[in-house]
């Protein structure tokens, strides 16, 4: 926990935005949480509870909430964006003219820009210009557990080492460890791909295929992360750390994961629409699967698990057919000889 205090604007009043805003406020930083839903934001500000996304969990009395974006970012030392990936570009555009001089921008959004498949740091850099410090906050972290003060470890990767350290220091505390790095491509890749792979393990568990199948899918899913990382310039150690393996294991095994729950529902025979309606929150994997496969096709590599998830989500094949295709694939060495060279 840093001895220095910062005024921080957290944009996005969903479960993860609320959890991070509460964490920062508890660490003594004047924190403002911005959201679009006036009724929900008013309730958070008055009652210090996000009854929709984190019911029954008390938020710090010092945490303020507002729907006024200009007021939220005014005089902010830095800004933390925590919105779904489909809203990321719009949010960055909104804050670009409002951002105080010198304020860095970090985000805990996971995914790619829908439609273009661009990494979020590319989107932010394009809109904000070359001089704004940027950082991505990622790693294995369920919002509910963070808000309850349970032990958590995350990582902050940035293109400005000093800013990444500022963000990590503000978050780091007695039960929340924050590491740093400078591989934004790898950090964002891990955070996006794990959502797709969590659907695969959820489907397998929904079909009651056993723990062996789950372990196999997680491990071969990591293989797919590493293969894509190798061709886009990410470092393998990033994917073997909190941003990759850590987030992958949590999202594939923890029932608080929306993407795993989507897979469970599909594996039990529910339709995609039924499953999303039952979850009641944004499920990033539906769009992210398309963008992952766009990247794979552009670079000419095979990602069979991710491709099967994409096909199931689009209704092109059933989960049973996807499983059959994966099991029928030609045998080959576990890792290409050139993967780590």
UniProtKB/Swiss-Prot annotation:
It catalyses: sn-glycerol 3-phosphate + NAD(+) = dihydroxyacetone phosphate + NADH + H(+); sn-glycerol 3-phosphate + NADP(+) = dihydroxyacetone phosphate + NADPH + H(+). Transmembrane segments: none annotated. Belongs to the NAD-dependent glycerol-3-phosphate dehydrogenase family. Pathway: Membrane lipid metabolism; glycerophospholipid metabolism. Catalyzes the reduction of the glycolytic intermediate dihydroxyacetone phosphate (DHAP) to sn-glycerol 3-phosphate (G3P), the key precursor for phospholipid synthesis. Sn-glycerol 3-phosphate binds at residues 110, 139, 141, 194, 247, 257-259. HAMAP family: NAD_Glyc3P_dehydrog. Its EC number is 1.1.1.94. This is Glycerol-3-phosphate dehydrogenase [NAD(P)+]. It is found in: Cytoplasm. Its main location: cytoplasm. InterPro entries: 6-PGluconate_DH-like_C_sf, 6PGD_dom2, G3P_DH_NAD-dep, G3P_DH_NAD-dep_C, G3P_DH_NAD-dep_N, NAD(P)-bd_dom_sf. It comes from Xanthomonas axonopodis pv. citri (strain 306). The active site is at residue 194. Gene3D superfamilies: N-(1-d-carboxylethyl)-l-norvaline Dehydrogenase, domain 2 (1.10.1040.10), NAD(P)-binding Rossmann-like Domain (3.40.50.720). NADPH binds at residues 15-16, 36, 110, 143, 258, 282, 284. One of its GO terms (molecular function) is NAD binding. GO terms for biological process: carbohydrate metabolic process; glycerol-3-phosphate biosynthetic process; glycerol-3-phosphate catabolic process; glycerophospholipid biosynthetic process. One of its GO terms (cellular component) is cytosol. Keywords: Cytoplasm, Lipid biosynthesis, Lipid metabolism, NAD, NADP, Nucleotide-binding, Oxidoreductase, Phospholipid biosynthesis, Phospholipid metabolism.
